[in-house]
Amino acid sequence: MNIRQQLTKFLGLFLTLASAFMFWKGLSVVTNSHSPIVVVLSGSMEPAFQRGDILFLWNRERFNKVGDVIVYEVDAKSIPIVHRVVREHRDKNGRQLLLTKGDNNAADDIALYGRKQSYLRRDKDIVGTVKGYLPKLGYVTILVSENQYAKFALMGMLALSSLLGSE
């Protein structure tokens, strides 16, 4: 294989990755969420959502209501949490404050929030409201993130397919 063919393959791979990145960023802008698609990682929302379900988020509402399923992140943790709003009210500045709980959990989420935080702030902590889902399709990402052998096998297969693939 000459240098021109190698450059063509590299450019094709680069364009594919750049297109995926632009699609993700475009989706982030449309949904107003830095993470418009998330995978359920635990069973805390069963039976509504199972581990491995892919959730589609929308963050253009000004307020959430009791019963909405939201995804939030707090300062202390970088993993998005999917739970239902069980209580809401406004602070003295008019900002919406939310209390959440997993459908399959006995207690609310106050213990998951940051230090000295009793409620989530709608304008600060919420990633988005769940608007749709695909069941079980997220298991691939769970497998890759939890199993280093699966991660290396997937990376190896992708590398081999890009090197050996023909036009």
UniProtKB/Swiss-Prot annotation:
Its EC number is 3.4.21.89. Coiled coil: none annotated. It is a single-pass type II membrane protein. Residues 25-167 are lumenal. Keywords: Endoplasmic reticulum, Hydrolase, Membrane, Protease, Signal-anchor, Transmembrane, Transmembrane helix. GO terms for biological process: protein targeting to ER; signal peptide processing. It catalyses: Cleavage of hydrophobic, N-terminal signal or leader sequences from secreted and periplasmic proteins. It is found in: Endoplasmic reticulum membrane. The keyword tRNA processing does not apply. The active site is at 44 (charge relay system), 83 (charge relay system), 109 (charge relay system). Residues 1-6 are cytoplasmic. The C-terminal short (CTS) helix is essential for catalytic activity. It may be accommodated as a transmembrane helix in the thinned membrane environment of the complex, similarly to the signal peptide in the complex substrates. Belongs to the peptidase S26B family. Catalytic component of the signal peptidase complex (SPC) which catalyzes the cleavage of N-terminal signal sequences from nascent proteins as they are translocated into the lumen of the endoplasmic reticulum. Specifically cleaves N-terminal signal peptides that contain a hydrophobic alpha-helix (h-region) shorter than 18-20 amino acids. This is Signal peptidase complex catalytic subunit SEC11. It comes from Eremothecium gossypii (strain ATCC 10895 / CBS 109.51 / FGSC 9923 / NRRL Y-1056) (Yeast).
